[in-house]
Amino acid sequence: MDWSKVYSYCERGGDPSFWAEPLNAISNGAFTIAGLIGAWQLIRSPRKDHALFEWLLVVLVIAIGIGSFMFHTYATVWAIPFDTIPISLFMLAYLGYALRRFAGAPWIIVIAALVGFYLTVRYAQGIQCSNELLPMTRGAGKRCFNGTLGYTPAFAALVLVGGVLLVQGHRAAGYLFAAAFLFLAAMTFRTIDLEVCTWTIRAGRGVGTHFLWHTLNGLLLYVLLLGAIRHGAPRDALPKAR
């Protein structure tokens, strides 16, 4: 187990203690709240199917909150998978869900899209900064866009799948577009966390903007859950028109 500390966010600075990132840690409650409200609405849903996949999405949202809380408190290398794995699983699961349940794509298309998405994310995560890019992307020991580039394929997927659903006239399209808007705002706050650190000093410590990344993501995941709960029933489980 690697106990090396990770100092990647403004709020932590160089403090190795458990509660060095109080806002970053507590704001993960947004994911737990989103998951619990989603579970409550799923229980109350009039759907006739068993909604097993929707329950998986709910569990993954709650797991994201728990894993991210662990990472922003322990802030060690061993805690990184607890933060990243639930996020990765949710992105893959929801993309497959949206393509299959919402868009009605055949399995071969769904599988190909998931493989392509995974490879695109891996590529985006490996993009190296150069000093010729925007100021916030300069090398100087910083991750490119503060590590946010790895999430851009997810934003693109929301927009593209939302566009397909819009053309199909599917009511879930609006949920994906709303989530894309929230995600764009969230990625912005994640990107500028270190850039604005000196402007957000309170009580002698930097606050940053990473907690807004959590808060907005909690809201967008709730929007995605709501779209799945309301409009994700299999076509043969939909009420018959009379």
Can you say where each PLM-predicted feature lies in the sequence?
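Multi-pass alpha-helical transmembrane bundles in non-GPCR membrane proteins
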Residues: M1-R242
